[in-house]
Amino acid sequence: MTAQTVRSLINQVEIAVSAAIDRVLPEAAGADPVVRPSEHADFQSNAALALAKRARTKPADLATAVADALRADGSTAVADVTVSGPGFLNLALADATVWTQVAARLADPRLGIDLPEQSRRTVIDYSGPNIAKEMHVGHLRTTIIGDALARVLGFLGAEVIRQNHLGDWGTQFGMLIQYLDEHPDATWHSDDLAPGTSTVSALDSLYRAARKEFDADPGFADRARARVVALQAGDEDTVARWREIVAESEVAFRQIYDRLGVLLEPSDSAGESFYNDRLLDIVDELTAAGIAQDSEGALVVLSQEVTGPDGDPATLMVRKTDGGYGYDTTDLATIRYRIRDLHADRLLYVVDARQALHFRLVFETARRAGWLTDAVDVAHVAFGTVLGPDGRPFKTRAGDTVKLMDLLDAATGKARATVAEKDHALTDDDLDHIAEAAGIGAVKYADLSTSRTKDYVFDVDRMVSFDGNTGVYLQYAHTRIQSILRKAGDMTATVDVALALHPAERALALQLDAFGGALTEVARLLEPHRLCNYLYELARAFTDFYEACPVLQADPSTRANRLALCHLTARTLRQGLDLLGIAAPERM
């Protein structure tokens, strides 16, 4: 089946209203028709309020003239138009128009969704855990927000390049490698660990021991520093051990990504070490252009746009006084590489809001260097913090950072108890499968349904609830529809456009038609919570429809139309959840 774009009903109405405005007020040609969904009609236009001054008339009079023009045009999109209030146009669609739209979307493998991002190459930087350290709650938001954006933009046609900027370089590796060499009995390889024990957990503990020895033993500290030099110089044995640590860590990260349903692959990894050979070029280029300058032995870029608390220009550290490089230089190398080598049209950095100043300075420097031009869009996709019940950054009772795997285990355990209480007939295997889908989905949805710039409290009890705006509620809505369709068996689900619409059918059909618009808003604003809100409203509209409109007990023609609505709702929910990286179970 070939995909075919279906023009949304709201867009059809916008075109009709715009044409009527052009006839009544030619000097306002191209003005926004300001069409929005309405509780008083299918859609409402407020354009007359904004244009009345230009027309030198009252908004109500202009609205009446536009309504007359709409009727005269004989628009197939607008069946009825009335004027209310100070000049609102209330616009109603013909029942046949709505049913035709349902049939068109149902017939299309992509639900009729357009490809507005087609041919746009978008590089998304997200997740970025540190090698030899466990992923913790701080990695949750970047990983799932970045993945959701990658999915949505890819579905809308963008060529998405995922970049996992691993923290895989630095002095800490010299310390860890030296400790491992001096303690050959240390257990940390995945094959040697007990089931359920993570390589990165073992390495993290060994690093802490190495740090303790580094601080207590000057001799070990000297040997660790020498090991750093050996690593940077490419010493064969040291590099081999470093690569071993990186490979084992990536296996552990893969377990988290697989469990979260994240699309990142090993080929998407381009850590700090990847850019090592490019750092000197960055220094030379910025120095030659007069952008970087000496500051007490260090090389810095003084901002022309941002000042610090003391009123002096904010600085970006290009090279330290000891000749080393930090993440400022590495991030400059990433942006140049992604523009010059990956040929990005759009760059997205899904990173904690606390890094806002850093990215302002990196983007400014890249523009001054000529790497970042108006042909490339760049954005720091900032996000807030996951909080504990006390309203502070989420920690364990001992004050440690919460491990991401522990957090997921807690959610799936709670989901298992909740699902078991609702359905006592489930087998243990079914219960485990459903609990994993519900628990992981609950964690992801709770995060994604929160405006990304806001902090939110991690409340697992609320997350796994079957009530309210939760992932479990949406998953359960999908399973209810699947139950109806299983009972329907081979019953026909074709659309008869001549049938009258029940108000609940109409509300559901209009909500289904708004799916593409919600996705476009996510892509434009980089805010996944808008898709969550859409899906929640869709599930609510289906609940209202199901309570008001019998499906299987209806007469054959009505039943066929209502089954078509069920099929389209299930497909839309399933597609929407998939774009969030959340499973849509058949049973629950």
Swiss-Prot record:
InterPro entries: aa-tRNA-synth_I_CS (IPR001412), Arg-tRNA-ligase (IPR001278), Arg-tRNA-synth_N (IPR005148), Arg-tRNA-synth_N_sf (IPR036695), ArgRS_core (IPR035684), DALR_anticod-bd (IPR008909), Rossmann-like_a/b/a_fold (IPR014729), tRNAsynth_Ia_anticodon-bd (IPR009080). Pfam families: Arg_tRNA_synt_N, DALR_1, tRNA-synt_1d. One of its GO terms (molecular function) is ATP binding. It comes from the Bacteria. Its main location: cytoplasm. PROSITE patterns: AA_TRNA_LIGASE_I. GO terms for cellular component: cytoplasm. A motif ('HIGH' region) lies at residues 129-139. Its EC number is 6.1.1.19. It is found in: Cytoplasm. It catalyses: tRNA(Arg) + L-arginine + ATP = L-arginyl-tRNA(Arg) + AMP + diphosphate. Keywords: Aminoacyl-tRNA synthetase, ATP-binding, Cytoplasm, Ligase, Nucleotide-binding, Protein biosynthesis. GO terms for biological process: arginyl-tRNA aminoacylation. NCBIfam families: argS. Monomer. PANTHER family: ARGININE--TRNA LIGASE, CYTOPLASMIC (PTHR11956:SF5), ARGINYL-TRNA SYNTHETASE (PTHR11956). Belongs to the class-I aminoacyl-tRNA synthetase family. This is Arginine--tRNA ligase. It comes from Frankia casuarinae (strain DSM 45818 / CECT 9043 / HFP020203 / CcI3).
